[in-house]
Regions:
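Short, amphipathic alpha-helical "recognition" segments used to contact nucleic acids or chromatin
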Residues: 73-88
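Short amphipathic alpha-helical segments
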Residues: 17-19, 27, 34-47
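Short, positively charged interaction helices/loops
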Residues: 51-77
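Short alpha-helical "recognition helix" segments of helix-turn-helix
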Residues: 27-30, 92-95
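Short Lys/Arg-enriched helix C-cap and helix-to-coil transition segments
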Residues: 55-61, 117-126
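Intrinsically disordered, low-complexity basic tails/linkers immediately adjacent to helix-turn-helix/homeobox/MYB/SANT
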Residues: 64-74, 122-143
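Short, basic interhelical loop/turn and adjoining N-cap
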Residues: 36-37, 95-106
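Short Lys/Arg-rich basic patches
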Residues: 1-19
Length: 143
């Protein structure tokens, strides 16, 4: 998994591959936009491509907190897992998130394969929500 810095990085070995010129131009343009090297993007694309092959229905998207896995149809995997923990029921989770049950099951399968990474996303979100709540209470008290 490359979607979050340092997660899943193992020993690296050089590999020589050839790409069409147009592909390299697009890759270099994307690397400039994202501020990464060509090599970094290739590593990310390969790792995430394998993950998507192994977990149909899962894609990776960028955001302010980094790259994260999510459902093709919307919610991030960590969001699905957090809601599922509340309901402990696939259909109720699907209804709440307005997703098909098959998408919820795909997210839960991904979670089973990458529990520590998703738990970290959930923890970070909970910490951010608690911090925002403290700020809101402090602002209310100051009024």
């Amino acid at each position: 998994m490359y979607y979050n810095e340092g997660m899943g990085r193992k020993t690296q070995a050089p590999v020589s591959t050839r790409y069409p010129g147009d592909t390299l131009k697009r890759l270099d343009r994307r690397a400039r936009v994202e501020g990464h090297s060509r090599s970094t993007l290739i590593q990310r694309y390969v790792a995430e491509g394998i993950e998507m092959d192994e977990h149909p229905g899962i894609v990776f998207r960028s955001g302010p907190a980094g790259r994260r896995p999510g459902l093709v149809s919307g919610a991030d995997v960590w969001e699905v897992v957090a809601v599922h923990r509340s309901f402990d029921d696939v259909q109720r989770t699907a209804d709440w998130l307005e997703q098909p049950a098959s998408a919820i099951e795909a997210a839960l399968r991904y979670y089973e394969a990458h529990r520590a990474v998703i738990d970290e996303w959930i923890q970070r979100n909970e910490e951010a929500a608690e911090a925002a709540e403290r700020v809101a209470r402090a602002q209310q008290g100051a009024s």
